[in-house]
């Protein structure tokens, strides 16, 4: 039996031989089957290596990003590592009407991707507490003595200087931003206060502090900063990574392209304080106006800005509507309501000769107070006595005229222009009174449900005051709920409901409002949005440095890709060599029996075999 030696290109010690009988299947396989098997083997091999490369490259990146987001939330409550030279710092002083607060922020080195924002977070001291300090009174109290402002604010700056590493002072930006209290001052007094700050602070502190770093910001700016801060903490400025993330189509303001882009849906904010109410949300689509007058008003309410570090990139360009309504806060609204009761009651008594509200025995019946509670309104030396009837529906009806709604389309409170909201694809967060009204007493903060809220509010209003006091004494309400909250909860519930549904025109079946005090267990201040916006160009420095390093390490990436292609090519060459060798074996196997048969035939005829192997 013949044997076939296989040596190929292997070393001599690897040479071996096989018998055709021992491997009949391989040698008897037809050409088409061999070709199909070989092609399939090559395809499977290439597919395998492609999957391995893609999983290693992109799968790891996705896992790393998810892990980094989780890690960021965990480390966000850890003490800031002040020994890390790659940590940068920023300081914002919020000069409000009742006092001033300093916030110290920090962020690691930018990752070099021009599409990503700085990862700014609040600095935490050795005890893991946020680096914040507040002083009183408000800065506007120094309107007549501006030369004392620097001394007034020095304790805040000294506090910040103690926490920011000394070596970082000269590269740490300082922003002093004044809000409501300063807005009401004459421009000359505002200028004198800011001038004193700009003159004295650089003498005593080494922070980055230029003329544009101290200013009185408008209510619109404050609202935009608050919107930026909330959405940054929610991660709405990040790239889309999961298919289940809420997205929205956006027409980029100022873009030459008319095509809409798809990006993460941002959240709107509703904030009802004691004096005012504010709404802010992104307007993703280009808006139209009912009149030229409405267009002029809209220009003052719409803000277009770029959060990215490259002004030519439109990925982080946003169009945000911001409107602030003075007198529509919870306490201010109650005051307006009582003023109306007082004026109307005095006038009716005078015209009709009645004594309503003038004595405790003949009180004015107030549907917006809990059942049987007694209260008083005192103005100009006169007193109007009230007694609650706890009628939530009547209370809502009574306060509806205070919305000052008009018949004009696309308007809200006081007839102010409001762009359309896509209620089926939107999300809002309600802060301050929106949260207090739903949580402090009713204990239903979080996801808002109009039907459940109105039922709970009706039940509360219709409950006797004596029972409410008993529940309060037993500690059944939130720890920070006081008697003032209990007394005016009925009114504020009705006011919040009317502002939200009638004033801002949210449908009663709207399910995407979340009332909250904090976001991810953090109280988000507008100052976070302010420093995000004002430091947006700082990543350019890190991006340039990253590009320089990348140019020196580019060959590594090229080598990595080249090696994979080289390996695949070698694999195909070896596979082709094996295929050709098998074909050669098959031809030899077929020719050998044919030659043997011919030689035997010649021998049987007694003739010499022609061209037989081994003959001359």
Swiss-Prot record:
The gene is ENTPD4. GO terms for cellular component: autophagosome membrane; cytoplasmic vesicle; Golgi apparatus; Golgi membrane; lysosomal membrane; membrane. GO terms for molecular function: CDP phosphatase activity; CTPase activity; GDP phosphatase activity; GTPase activity; nucleoside diphosphate phosphatase activity; ribonucleoside triphosphate phosphatase activity; UDP phosphatase activity. Its EC number is 3.6.1.15, 3.6.1.6, 3.6.1.42. Disulfide bonds join 368-395, 461-490. It comes from the Eukaryota. It comes from Homo sapiens (Human). Residues 55-559 are lumenal. It catalyses: a ribonucleoside 5'-diphosphate + H2O = a ribonucleoside 5'-phosphate + phosphate + H(+); a ribonucleoside 5'-triphosphate + H2O = a ribonucleoside 5'-diphosphate + phosphate + H(+); UDP + H2O = UMP + phosphate + H(+); UTP + H2O = UDP + phosphate + H(+). GO terms for biological process: CTP metabolic process; GDP catabolic process; nucleobase-containing small molecule catabolic process; UDP catabolic process. Belongs to the GDA1/CD39 NTPase family. Keywords: Calcium, Cytoplasmic vesicle, Disulfide bond, Glycoprotein, Golgi apparatus, Hydrolase, Lysosome, Magnesium, Membrane, Transmembrane, Transmembrane helix. Glycans are attached at residues 404, 407. Its cofactor is Ca(2+); Mg(2+). Ubiquitous. Highest expression in testis and lowest in bladder. The keyword Disulfide bond applies. It holds the Pfam family GDA1_CD39. This is Ectonucleoside triphosphate diphosphohydrolase 4. Signal peptide: none annotated. Residues 1-33, 581-616 are cytoplasmic.
């Amino acid at each position: 039996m013949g044997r076939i030696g296989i040596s190929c290109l292997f070393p001599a010690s690897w040479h071996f031989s096989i018998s055709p009988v021992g491997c009949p299947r391989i040698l008897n396989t037809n050409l088409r089957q061999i070709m199909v098997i070989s092609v399939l083997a090559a395809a499977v091999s290439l597919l395998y290596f492609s999957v391995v490369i893609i999983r290693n490259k992109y799968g790891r990146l996705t896992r790393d990003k998810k892990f980094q987001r989780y890690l960021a939330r965990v480390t966000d409550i850890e003490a800031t590592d002040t020994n890390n030279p790659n940590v940068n710092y920023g300081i914002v002083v919020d000069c409000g009407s009742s006092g001033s607060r300093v916030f110290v922020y920090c962020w690691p080195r930018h990752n070099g991707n021009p599409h990503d924002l700085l990862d700014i977070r609040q600095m935490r001291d050795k005890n893991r507490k946020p680096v914040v300090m507040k002083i009183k009174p408000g800065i506007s109290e120094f309107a007549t003595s501006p030369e004392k402002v620097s001394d007034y604010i020095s304790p805040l700056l000294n506090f910040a200087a103690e926490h920011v590493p000394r070596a970082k002072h000269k590269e740490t930006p300082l922003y002093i931003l004044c809000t409501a209290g300063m807005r009401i001052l004459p421009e000359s007094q505002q200028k004198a206060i800011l001038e004193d700050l700009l003159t004295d602070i650089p003498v005593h502190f080494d922070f980055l502090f230029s003329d544009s770093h101290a200013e009185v910001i408008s209510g619109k700016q404050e609202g935009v900063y608050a919107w930026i801060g909330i959405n940054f903490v929610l991660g709405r400025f990040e790239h889309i990574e999961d298919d289940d993330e809420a997205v929205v189509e956006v027409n980029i303001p100022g873009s030459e392209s008319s095509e809409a882009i798809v990006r993460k849906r941002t959240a709107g904010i509703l904030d009802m304080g004691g004096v005012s109410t504010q709404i802010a949300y992104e307007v993703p689509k280009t808006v139209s106006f009912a009149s030229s007058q409405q267009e002029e008003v809209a220009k003052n309410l719409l803000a277009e800005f770029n959060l990215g570090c490259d002004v030519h990139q439109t990925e982080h360009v946003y169009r945000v509507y911001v409107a602030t309504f003075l007198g529509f806060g919870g306490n201010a609204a109650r005051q307006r309501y009582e003023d109306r009761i007082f004026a109307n009651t005095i006038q009716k008594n005078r015209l009709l000769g009645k004594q309503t509200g003038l004595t405790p025995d003949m009180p004015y019946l107030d549907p917006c107070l809990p059942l049987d509670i007694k209260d008083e309104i005192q103005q100009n030396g006169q007193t109007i006595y009230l007694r609650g009837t706890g009628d939530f529906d009547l209370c809502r009806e009574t306060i509806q005229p205070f919305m000052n709604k008009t018949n004009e389309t696309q308007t809200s409170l006081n007839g102010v222009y409001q762009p359309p909201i896509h209620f089926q694809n939107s999300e809002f967060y309600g802060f301050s009174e929106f949260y207090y009204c739903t949580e402090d007493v009713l204990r239903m903060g979080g996801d808002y449900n109009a039907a459940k809220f109105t039922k709970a509010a009706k039940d509360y209003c219709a409950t006797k005051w004596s029972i409410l006091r008993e529940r309060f004494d037993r500690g059944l309400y939130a720890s920070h709920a006081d008697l003032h909250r209990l007394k005016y909860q009925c009114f504020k519930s009705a006011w919040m409901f009317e502002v939200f549904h009638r004033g801002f025109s949210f449908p009663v079946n709207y399910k995407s409002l979340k009332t909250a005090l904090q976001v991810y267990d953090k109280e988000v201040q507008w100052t976070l949005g302010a420093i995000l916006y004002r430091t947006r160009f700082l990543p350019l420095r890190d991006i340039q440095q990253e590009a320089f390093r990348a140019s020196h390490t580019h060959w590594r990436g090229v080598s990595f890709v080249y090696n994979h292609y080289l390996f695949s090519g070698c694999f195909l060459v070896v596979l082709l060599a094996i295929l050709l060798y098998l074909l050669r074996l098959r031809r030899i196997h077929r020719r050998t029996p044919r030659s043997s048969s011919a030689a035997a035939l010649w021998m049987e005829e007694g003739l010499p075999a022609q061209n037989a192997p081994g003959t001359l």
